[in-house]
Amino acid sequence: MRQEHTATDVAIAAPVSFVLRANVAGAARRMIAIAYLRIAFGVIWSVDAALKWQPAFQANFSQIVAGVAQGQPGFLSWWFAIWQVIVSGRAPIFALLTATTETYLAFALIAGFARKFTYAIGIAYGLFVWSVAEGFGGPYMPGTTTDVGAAIIYSLVFWALFLVDAGRMSVDRLIAARVPAWRRISG
């Protein structure tokens, strides 16, 4: 026996269609919000990069690295001593690498270029800055430390973007349309 559809069947189906459209619209808004977050993060990095290109940063890079070691716990002294030796005599190269890396991160975040690769570089670079230039956020002594450093937060933001970035408003979408293999780099 075949059952006939009644008017109530149609009335029940209509809200489901509405809910699906609402979910799609909500997901699109979420993806656009994530893209705006990525772009705003890129603007923050562009300010940071501009500061790294200043002559004072370039000239004082070695002193900046040496200054971080002051007041750190003894068990970390080897870590900072290694970096002082590495940077010693090579400060202009490291200052240039720092400025270039931050400029790349700013550009790539704003444009949405090679997103997965950029986020991986950002995570690693943030951890590097946190452990060397920020001294793991220390020294951790009562009355002297008020936070754990900014670069660790930058790494967490890069990690979050790595996990949820949807690719809206990005140059990667244009490149991937012409070069499908680009999706491996862009996400």
Regions inferred by a protein language model and the residue ranges of each:
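Extended, low-polarity transmembrane helix blocks
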Residues: R2-Y104, A111-G187
